[in-house]
Amino acid sequence: MGGKNSRETTPDTSYQRSNSVTYAARHQHAPAPQRRLDRRYSRIGDNYETLEQVTSALAQAGLESSNLIVGIDFTKSNEWTGMRSYNGRSLHSVGALQNPYEQAISIIGQTLAAFDEDNLIPCFGFGDASTHDHGVFSFYPDSRPCQGFEDVLSRYREIVPQLKLSGPTSFAPIIEMAMTIVEESGGQYHVLLIIADGQVTRSVDTGSGQLSSQERNTIEAIVKASNHPLSIILVGVGDGPWDLMKEFDDNIPARTFDNFQFVNFTDIMSKNVDPLRKQTEFAVNALMEIPSQYQATLQLGILGARRGYSPATVPLPPPSNDILRSPSVHQYHVN
């Protein structure tokens, strides 16, 4: 996803929200002994066929509201991974019509809006020249969340012209950012939506049967995230390839519960069927594991609990934030 020769040295610091509460140094503890999970949650299947079935299952699971976090991939490969699926244009090209990233955000937003009662959505970018594979940047200079998906889309359009696509690609920083937010919320249930254009970076120097540092860090982050009430949905846009994403979905060992769902946005949206039907199929595929994942966090006793060993992550400001408009500061608090 990112450039082959990208290098970066973004330092790790602590996460600070706009109300000046510092998400900084925290004591590191060994993970608490884990309860034995019902086998049906160790590998959660794709269970539903209609959006109504998913919505009903969410309600039956007791999920009345969730907190959303959005992560957007700004690696350089977005310039060419739309060669087949997006008529050769950059997947981040901004014009009169929505690009694949905007389409995915809009459809998920329409579906999950009813479950995000405070309408505050922390949004982050990764893989650009400021973050590479070591960090994330917030959509707002003071790290406050976006106010609904319309604000997400608006800020996305303002940010895209100001940044430089780069790499390499790792999902570890955005997953660690999400774990920090979950921990500081007191263990509230969150859904992390990552929209990305392909694989985690795998160098030509990585031998057969070995993992690149980006692959290893991503897998470790997914495993650690399963100790938190956090579901991860990775939406793939562009041409792929997607084989490693499917491995992440099905075959990562040692997780407390199956916390990761991969959805091939391009495959669904390229079908020759009614647009509304495609949008529904995409939403169903993205959300179908959420009811069982939420039930797993209840059974494991990790919902509503601080784990005490999440990363302490701070986002950078958005690229060229002096150019971006900055409305009056909106404080948001963890309840």
What residue ranges belong to the model's regions?
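Acidic, low-complexity intrinsically disordered regions
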Residues: 1-335
